[in-house]
């Protein structure tokens, strides 16, 4: 089964996961900017960093994915995927970004990334400051886990990257490559 890993990364954690996944599966990784190269692939694995509710490069890359290809979609962000409310919010956002048929056929996984405020672009620093200022005085009982985490990590360097979280994804890929169904 012809397969490819496509990733959209702004600050490096998504690229790290894509390269590690490549090592574990022997599937070539490419940036979403090269997405035109996916033609003929039967399995497309997309990893995208979460930024302001969107998945980096997904809209661009989806245009090139073969309609009949199997799709694994992996988001990478600060939100803890162990929190069901975070997952619900991420998936709600994904639904808005993807055609319905692509969303329905995608196997979706979520990984934690990291953030280093010193590395952020001016635009992203400004967005984070505005977001922080808009939520910092919210009563604790009204805060989501995602909001609490953002406030706790604001202006710091945090890294939640964990290679072990790739294990279920590798298992799913190997199952698909051996002809296994959902």
Predicted regions and their residues:
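FMN-binding flavodoxin-like domain, especially the glycine-rich phosphate-binding loop
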Residues: 53-182
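N-terminal beta1-alpha1-beta2 submodule of the flavodoxin-like/Rossmannoid cofactor-binding fold
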Residues: 1-68, 171-182
